[in-house]
């Protein structure tokens, strides 16, 4: 999980989700693309 100031999709499979006021990028196929904003 990378924590970044700005999150963006790195592949077509990435999904942007908002949980508890934070933006997350999750990717089932390639989990190394996981990111969190903050």
Curated annotation (Swiss-Prot):
InterPro entries: Ribosomal_bL36, Ribosomal_bL36_sp, Ribosomal_L36_bact. It holds the Pfam family Ribosomal_L36. GO terms for biological process: translation. The keyword Ribonucleoprotein applies. One of its GO terms (molecular function) is structural constituent of ribosome. It comes from the Bacteria. PROSITE patterns: RIBOSOMAL_L36 (PS00828). GO terms for cellular component: ribonucleoprotein complex; ribosome. The keyword Repeat does not apply. Keywords: Ribonucleoprotein, Ribosomal protein. Belongs to the bacterial ribosomal protein bL36 family. This is Large ribosomal subunit protein bL36. The gene is rpmJ.
């Amino acid at each position: 999980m990378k924590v970044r100031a700005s999150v963006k999709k790195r592949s077509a499979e990435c999904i942007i989700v908002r949980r508890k006021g934070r933006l997350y990028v999750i990717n089932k196929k390639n989990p190394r693309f996981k990111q969190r904003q903050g």
